[in-house]
Amino acid sequence: MTKVLFITANPNSAEGSFGMAVGEAFIEAYKNEHPQDEVVTIDLFNTTVPAIDADVFAAWGKFAAGEGFEALTEAQQQKVAAMNTNLETFMHADRYVFVTPMWNFSYPSVVKAYLDNLAIAGKTFKYTENGPVGLLEGKKALHIQATGGVYSEGPYAAVDFGRNHLKTVLGFIGVNETEYIAVEGMNANPEKAQEIKEAAIANARELAKRF
């Protein structure tokens, strides 16, 4: 049985978000096409996603010195435990669907924090004499991103940092097959917003058949 993580980073529901509407349409279609698979939703705005801070660095330092989990402070234990939960959940899944809005040329900061929970040496990648090698082979991802302007092509494509960063990090940890659905231009062309949404939903439903 394939396990799919539906990872969202939007405080709005599908009723108030173009991206979420497309994401939920994809998941609904995927479930219809693959009823035997397990889909787990991870709402990053309602999940404990520790940032790498002084507590985390201190905990890692203690581990490097050979100390155990019991040597950590309560705050360090809570953060390390949450990070490990996020990491283990991700590692044991087969497919990943990220749904994010673009905020100031990137995605919400909680997505960056989440990726920092995942890119852990010895777990999702390893160092070799030829450089780092990703360990999560045989998995695939989909990124659905909603943007008010057009960023998939044209002069602003170079500043689509969220899309590029997510693809880079996933590739670094071994997830080299990443599909992308752009839900874009709704603010630039408000008269076409509904048309843009419907086209993206149709694209998502079609992709669900082969994802």
From Swiss-Prot:
Annotated EC: 1.6.5.-, 1.7.1.17
Catalytic activity as recorded in UniProt: 2 a quinone + NADH + H(+) = 2 a 1,4-benzosemiquinone + NAD(+); N,N-dimethyl-1,4-phenylenediamine + anthranilate + 2 NAD(+) = 2-(4-dimethylaminophenyl)diazenylbenzoate + 2 NADH + 2 H(+)
Cofactor binding summary note: Binds 1 FMN per subunit.
Keywords, in A-Z order: Flavoprotein, FMN, NAD, Oxidoreductase
Any matching Pfam family: Flavodoxin_2
Molecular function terms from GO: electron transfer activity; FMN binding; oxidoreductase activity, acting on NAD(P)H as acceptor; oxidoreductase activity, acting on NAD(P)H, quinone or similar compound as acceptor
UniProt-listed InterPro entries: Flavodoxin_fold, Flavoprotein-like_sf, FMN-dep_NADH:Q_OxRdtase_AzoR1, NADH:quinone_OxRdtase_FMN_depd
Positions bound to FMN: M102, W103, N104, F105
Required cofactor names: FMN
Job of this protein: Quinone reductase that provides resistance to thiol-specific stress caused by electrophilic quinones. Also exhibits azoreductase activity. Catalyzes the reductive cleavage of the azo bond in aromatic azo compounds to the corresponding amines.
Family to which the UniProt record says this protein belongs: Belongs to the azoreductase type 1 family.
Subunit structure: Homodimer.
Protein name, UniProt field: FMN-dependent NADH:quinone oxidoreductase 3
Species per Swiss-Prot/TrEMBL record: Bacillus anthracis
Source taxonomy: Bacteria, Bacillati, Bacillota, Bacilli, Bacillales
